[in-house]
Every structure is written in structure tokens, then in C-alpha cells.
Amino acid sequence: MTLTRREFIKHSGIAAGTLVVTSAAPLPAWAEEKGGKILTAGRWGAMNVEVKDGKIVSSTGALAKTIPNSLQSTAADQVHTTARIQHPMVRKSYLDNPLQPVKGRGEDTYVQVSWEQALKLIHEQHDRIRKANGPSAIFAGSYGWRSSGVLHKAQTLLQRYMNLAGGYSGHSGDYSTGAAQVIMPHVVGSVEVYEQQTSWPLILENSQVVVLWGMNPLNTLKIAWSSTDEQGLEYFHQLKKSGKPVIAIDPIRSETIEFFGDNATWIAPNMGTDVALMLGIAHTLMTQGKHDKVFLEKYTTGYPQFEEYLTGKSDNTPKSAAWAAEITGVPEAQIVKLAELMAANRTMLMAGWGIQRQQYGEQKHWMLVTLAAMLGQIGTPGGGFGFSYHYSNGGNPTRVGGVLPEMSAAIAGQASEAADDGGMTAIPVARIVDALENPGGKYQHNGKEQTYPNIKMIWWAGGGNFTHHQDTNRLIKAWQKPEMIVVSECYWTAAAKHADIVLPITTSFERNDLTMTGDYSNQHIVLMKQAVAPQFEARNDFDVFADLAELLKPGGKEIYTEGKDEMAWLKFFYDAAQKGARAQRVTMPMFNAFWQQNKLIEMRRSEKNEQYIRYGDFRADPVKNALGTPSGKIEIYSRTLEKFGYKDCPAHPTWLAPDEWKGTADEKQLQLLTAHPAHRLHSQLNYAELRKKYAVADREPITIHTEDAARFGIANGDLVRVWNKRGQILTGAVVTDGIKKGVVCVHEGAWPDLENGLCKNGSANVLTADIPSSQLANACAGNSALVYIEKYTGNALKLTAFDQPAVQA
């Protein structure tokens, strides 16, 4: 029931089983012979891991690079942190009486149990709940972090087990691009946010102006969905050296803007006003006659209706540069200059995703496509737009060679009766709390009325939903409703501390796997060799679900694994990639030789792919290469959305003022920006030594404009209480001119650590609103929130976010 990013990008899957081993595989002897250096990979790239005396002591990147990646130093922290879950645990009240625990989740102590006890308890309660309520009562969407490997994928393996059990409720979409990936098929016929981009070589050769709209690639390109090929940052480095002008539109002077230095012009609009700014630019293009009428006529539909809105004919409000200046805080003259600059040059509009993680977020990328269409450069070398240059190294040309298939939630020869009977469903991922609060409730989604399932059981496998979901306090209340919550995880996250049953799982350094670098480039195949033995009682997800499959029915383990162990599956995946490579006349070594060599495989460059232009074929022949929209063209006005009739997502790009923004703020309220952190992957690695690089007063930092800090009596390094009607957090002040006045930034991903209602660690989502972007996508809107700030003068509170929970002896 879940379509992953990898599926968006790769469009490949395989019905496959998983490993079941009852003991740790022995460490390979060659590790000692070669000084203990082991090649592996994570989402932050291929790494060499050094092992001494059974412990990881260091890790470094395995690929050459110009810009260092701090995340690659964290392998030892990941394995040996004191935040690891060490043993199977059950909440005491739940263990005493699973049907009526006397204490709530998050208030109880834990009891250590054996693996046999834990799995037996899960099986019995899962079976009871499923028989009483049906498959839709079991939520196994389990959104969150994942291993880079093609085999050991927690969410997939959970859903594989649930399919064998008879089905489950899953999720649709993701928190990263929830609004854009639903609106874009209506506009350009694809999800767009996970598509290959016009190649970087063409950008460097042909683009004259590059606009970075709400994106910070120096942070976000440290990671990928699989494993980063690290080329995106190298290309941005080349862009800097080229001296091409860069326009950076962002409320905060990000690391990327600092990186470009004098090459970059920083424009800081009020948060949430990007559509108004784009409309002001579009209006200027139109009034100056600089919009490309030929392109609009040939390649788009609906521009005349949009122009009526742009001119104010439809609502008596011309969307002029002066109008936009009032809303955005960007001077009228600068808006006019932007329009003229874009029209006079080959311009690439690169946009990030944070701008659509807002109320009415669907409008942002739709309007940017409309602006690009008015410029008429879509489908040209170095012109148009791109939504994935900041993610997984989009634009690094796709290589020729083998591509690894991945584990599937489907089992060969098995079909879910629940799916056939309509017993399985999927809810928009960011609406999990709405579903818990309103079982059986009706809601609109992408033109259809849907029904929330009555969720009685939740299993979250390897995900930090207490950090990535909005309005933490509301989530905690809703989290009390299900009858059973299981978390299988490596670390004592806030989600784990609010579970009934907690299972300790291995990290990627404690098992074997394979991965590829570059979600778009498929540049390398990298082995992920087990570096150390499983810590404490940690087990692979595979083992856990295979054992549970056996409890479902005799022979269940054999069905689940399809009779293959870990190395057999890795060989199976590798052999499939090798076969694909052979068809393209690319040679790969045999699996056993590859595994022993401790080297990655780099695929062959493609001159054709280095000349790839997104929408180039469409521009060359819009009839033969029609888009996947009803008209076959770019839809600036959508008849489909017109029929939906959603007031919060009209039929053309529209400026819709959010509920919480500068325009609704009182004199003491500030807008909250929840940007991507520099030294974490969302909440991953919050416990690591890297925290010392950014924590202020041992808290998550808050970036405050100098004038705002002075107004509230806050100095650099002070503890700052940040609050609104949803909650309060404690942060450490970073005072600077590098942020828009009236905006504060708390990076997303700090682990919640609540004491008497105050989050001591500074988790931004304690403050954000859990509202849908619109009825169309129902995506998260975490960047639409107002807050108050003050210097904290209370007693210093001890940070406990990374501590073990209380355990009853």
C-alpha cells in the first residue's frame, strides 16, 4: 500500500524474500588482514569503516570529494551510542494486562523480556485484533528512516509480513513532498519531484542564471534515498567556480548562500509568500510583453484563464510587483529586476521542497512551473525548472550498467485476500493523527471521498514519527488510542518510549547488504559488509518477521524467506544487476569475487545521458511526446481540479494566505522556519558527537535576527523559550543578520524530550500545526506556524532525550 521514493525513481521492484538467521554471521577474516578497514555505505555515501577489538573506531568517506560530509564520521556513534535499545522490552502495564493497561504510553516503566516472550505476545495480540477488526485495523505504514540496502529495509519487511498475515492499512505520499507529488501529475503528468533533471553538464554549459528557490543543497545533498554518489555537491562547486550569477530566494541565509558568497544575490521574502512573489514576477513579464506567447500557446493549456487572475480581471486585484512587494517584503524594484533578469537570460529555476511543506503548499510548485512556462525555456539546455537538484544528486547523468533490484513487500506466489476483498487501505501519511482521532471519518483526497480506518494496532519499524509529525502534544494524545503499539528500532527514540513492545534491531553495520549510489545516476554498486557483531540482543528485521511468519502458520518462515538466506538474496540481487549490465555490454565480476574484493563498482558514463534535457522530447514534438495530463500539455488551468471544487486548491495557481503568517501575526509573534539540519538526516544522528558542532547551551539552536533578539532582550548563547498554543520548547540563541526579520529558525529533527510540558531538547514539531496542505494532497504544513520567544530564566533542565527509559528490575 506504500509507493516509495525508490519506486518513483527506479520504477523497478522484485518479489523477493529475506534473510532468516538465528545467529550473527562471522566477521570476514579479510577485515583483520587488511587492517580492519571495511567498505560499506549509508545514506550519506560509501564509507570505509575501521574496526578494532570488535568495535568501530572511525569512519570516512570512500569517494573523492571537494566538500566534506560530516555525516560520514558517525558510524561509531550509530553502533555504540548509549541510546541503543539493548533488549526486548514491554511496557509494565501492558505486560500485566494487554487488554487494559493501567498507565498510559509514555508514563510507564519497561520490563525486559526474552525474544520468545516478546514475539509470542505480539503474535497473540496481533491475531486477536486482526480477527476482531479485520486487516484495516492494523496500521503498518511505518513511515520513516531506512537502511540504504536493497535487502534490509525495515518498512518493506514489516509490510511483507503483514501481507502474509492478511493485509494492513498503509500510507500514501511522504512528508518531504506530500503536496507537490499530488499536484504535479495534474500539471505536468508526473510526480516530478523524483524525476531525473536536465544534466549538470548542460547547466554548466548553457545556464546563464541559476535561481535557488527555497533550497539548501549544501545540507540536503549530504544524503540520498539510497546512498549519495556525492556528485551534486561537486557540480555546485563547479557552478560556483564558473562565476555564473546565482539568485537565492530563502528567508534564511543558508550554508549554500554563504558558500556562493559574492556570486549569490540573497532575496529573503516573508515566509509562505513565494506564490505572491512568483505572481509579481509573472505580472511584470506579462505587462512588459516578455512572456513567451508562442510557448504558452503550443505547450500549455489554460493560460488565458490564469492571465485573467494575474491581471485582476477575475478578482479586481492585479498581481503586480507592487502588490507582491506588500505581501512578500521584497521591494517592488527588486521584483521587477528579477523578472527582467530571468527573461533576458537562459534561466534555470531550481526549487526545493520546504516551500510546499506549508498550508496551500500545492500552489508553490504549480506556480513555479507556470512561471517557467511564461519564460518559455522549458525543454531547452540549461533552462526551465527542476525540483530535485537538491536531492539525491539529481542532474548527475544516469550511468549505463547494472541496477540492483530491491526487496518487495509482495511474496512470490502469495496474494493477500484482504487486497482482493478491499480490506486494505492507505491514508495520506501526514494524516495519521486525524485517522486515530476520527475512526470511520470521511475526508476528501485528490478528488475522492475516503474513509479513515479504525486503527487498533500500530507497528512502526525503524521510523521517528514523533520527530517528523507535526504538533507533538496532539500526537501523544492520539497515540493512546490503539490497543497495541509495537516499535522495532535501533534507538530509544520518543516513539519507542511511547510503545507497548519495543524490539532491538541491528544497524546496517551489523549485517550484510548491497546498495547503489545515486538514485538518478546509478553510478556505483557498493557492498555493505557487516563490520561488527550485533550489539546486545539486537536482531535483523528479517529474523524477527520470519519468526513471526512461522507463528502465523506452519511453514510461514519458508514462505516469507522463499528459502533464501542473507547471502543467497544478495547474490540474487547482484546477479540480476549483472544480467542487466551484460545486456548493455558492461562487465561486472562474479558475485563471490566482487564480495571478496572490498571495492565498489562504477558504471559506465553515457554521452547520451550527459545531454539529457528534462522535457526536451516534449518540446521537440509535443504531440508524439505528450505529457500524462488530460490535455497532454502543461496545465496552467486544470479542468480536473475545477471539477473537484476545492476552495483550498483552485483550478489555477493562486495566492492563498495561510492561517499563520506575518499577515495574521500580532506584534510579538514571529514566523517559524523548520529547515533541514546541517549535521543530521532529520532526526537521525541527533544523539551523535556531531551534536557538539551545533548545540547551543546543550539545546537545539534557534536562529534569531539581531533586531528581534534585541527587542526581546536575547543575547547570543542565551536559553530561549519558544511557545505557542500547541506547546513550548527550550532552545539556544544564535543571533545574526542572516535571517529575515520576523522569522526564527529551529531546524527540524531534534528528539522530543518533554518535562512538565516543556521540550528540553528543542523539537520544532512541538510548535508546528498538524493541518493538511489542502483537501487535494492532505500533506504536512510544518512551515506555517507563528511563535513567541523570550529569554528563559527558569531552572536549567537536564536533557534526557537520549537516555534509556526507566526499567523495572
Swiss-Prot record:
Predicted to be exported by the Tat system. The position of the signal peptide cleavage has not been experimentally proven. It catalyses: trimethylamine + 2 Fe(III)-[cytochrome c] + H2O = trimethylamine N-oxide + 2 Fe(II)-[cytochrome c] + 3 H(+). Its EC number is 1.7.2.3. One of its GO terms (cellular component) is outer membrane-bounded periplasmic space. Its main location: periplasm. One of its GO terms (biological process) is anaerobic respiration. It is found in: Periplasm. Pfam families: Molybdopterin (PF00384), Molybdopterin_N (PF18364), Molydop_binding (PF01568). Residues 1-31 form the signal peptide. Its cofactor is Mo-bis(molybdopterin guanine dinucleotide). Belongs to the prokaryotic molybdopterin-containing oxidoreductase family. Expression of torYZ allows E.coli to grow anaerobically on a wider range of substrates than does expression of torCAD. This is Trimethylamine-N-oxide reductase 2. It comes from Escherichia coli O6:H1 (strain CFT073 / ATCC 700928 / UPEC). The gene is torZ.
